């Protein structure tokens, strides 16, 4: 809903060419703002109302391994904590009513980007496993109440509420 907030420890945002084309493909921005082709400033930390299109972004080299999605009005949320050394990037997909009528926010911890494996491999931006090699990672999901914005989620799942907006 438009009352939803996304907090992540991101610095950079890269626009994927998928979507409604509001931002220049592969353009780079500072979290949480993205400037559209028309000069409009989008705040990716706030979910816009339905009907606002659809887009896909990469948040490379996040500072810590977590993200939080909070309903600011109800003051409830969900967070995910994961090992940053395994998943150093986030993918952010927003279908805001403009793609198949879906209204959703999808945040995915990722080992590489972009989502096209051949391109990620060409750019040296994907993880590799040797034949027979296995990878295990501990991922922690947390639910919380009484918080409108998140400053940080500690590795053990402790929510640190933002006191004056979010530093990210």
Can you describe what each PLM-predicted range is?
Residues 70-112:
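Glycine-rich active-site loops that engage anionic ligands at enzyme catalytic sites
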Residues 145-168:
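Terminal connector regions
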Residues 112-128:
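A conserved acidic, glycine/proline-rich C-terminal tail/linker
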Residues 12, 19, 73, 84, ...:
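A broadly conserved detector of short glycine/acidic/proline-rich loop/turn motifs that flank catalytic sites
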Residues 127-145:
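Short Pro-Gly-centered flexible turn/kink motifs
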Residues 60-63, 71-74, 97-101, 129-135:
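A structural signal for short secondary-structure junctions
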Residues 1-79:
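Active-site/ligand-binding surface loops and adjacent short beta/alpha elements
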Residues 65-67, 105, 137:
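Hydrophobic residues positioned within well-ordered beta-strands of beta-sheet architectures
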